[in-house]
UniProtKB/Swiss-Prot annotation:
The gene is ndhK. It catalyses: a plastoquinone + NADH + (n+1) H(+)(in) = a plastoquinol + NAD(+) + n H(+)(out); a plastoquinone + NADPH + (n+1) H(+)(in) = a plastoquinol + NADP(+) + n H(+)(out). The keyword Translocase applies. InterPro entries: NADH_UbQ_OxRdtase-like_20kDa, NADH_UQ_OxRdtase_20Kd_su. PANTHER family: NADH DEHYDROGENASE (PTHR11995), NADH DEHYDROGENASE [UBIQUINONE] IRON-SULFUR PROTEIN 7, MITOCHONDRIAL (PTHR11995:SF14). This is NAD(P)H-quinone oxidoreductase subunit K. It holds the Pfam family Oxidored_q6.
């Protein structure tokens, strides 16, 4: 019967096969135990690794964002923790159509967030008003007319992968900032693009042709000898049906 290997032989075999690199040696040199950096890099590294978003979803774009909270995309790996209070958040994600009635509430939430704070405009309806801006008189034509926007995420709606790309780009922006120069690059006015103006347009279909007064006026204004399609209906109404 062969003899069993000793404990030292088993340890040597384990180090040779399982850990070929070996255990790193601890050095006492000062240059190997100290990492030199700046206060800006340390501050930015802490902020970009713990962005706490405030989710402001008003339409279908938020459904795509809700998919990130599941296990398939793992939204938490970026250090993003959704918050329900604006005083605990430093990232505002606006997803969906913003109306005139909701605009004061959105501005109030943004003003309650502590500095430094960032805004992501998610979706076409948030950036330009989208398809609702053509006929609606209450849709805001771009959220940047209300609050400053740091990153635009187009799409109708954007995919979850696009949201990840936007978060990565925002992390790069946060990592390149400087505490001394941040106040110089902030927007001095809230309305970032063109002036938000609405022009009242008269409706094409007013329903006036359905009124009896309008029909009588049209008959009176018609030239002599010319009949209208409604002459017989107006002058000679249909007799009432008498039930036996």
């Amino acid at each position: 019967m062969p003899e069993s290997p000793s404990i030292s032989a088993v340890r040597d075999l384990r180090e040779a096969t399982c850990g070929p690199i070996g255990t790193p040696e601890v050095t006492n040199e000062l240059s190997e135990n100290i990492i030199l950096t700046s206060l800006d890099d340390l501050h930015n590294w802490a902020r970009l690794s713990s962005l706490w978003p405030l989710l402001y979803g008003t339409a279908c774009c938020f459904i795509e964002f809700a998919a990130l909270l599941g296990s398939r995309f793992d939204f938490d790996r970026f250090g993003l923790v959704p918050r329900s209070s604006p005083r605990q958040a430093d990232l505002l994600i606006v997803a969906g159509t913003v109306t005139m009635k909701m605009a004061p509430a959105l501005v109030r939430l943004y003003e309650q967030m502590p500095e430094p704070k960032y805004v992501i405009a998610m979706g076409a309806c948030t950036i330009t008003g989208g398809m609702f801006s053509a006929d609606s008189t209450t849709a805001v034509r771009g959220v940047d007319k209300l609050i400053p926007v740091d990153l635009y995420l187009p799409g109708c709606p954007p995919r979850p992968e696009a949201i990840f790309d936007a978060v990565i780009k925002l992390r790069k922006k946060v990592g390149d900032e400087s505490l001394a120069e941040r106040s110089k690059h902030q927007q001095t006015h809230r309305y970032f693009t063109m002036t938000h103006q609405m022009k009242a347009v008269e409706p094409q279909v007013t329903g006036a042709y359905l009124r009896a007064e309008s029909q009588q006026a049209a008959l009176a204004a018609a030239p002599a000898g010319q009949t209208l399609a409604t002459d017989a209906a107006v002058l000679n109404p249909a007799p009432e049906m008498v039930q036996p």
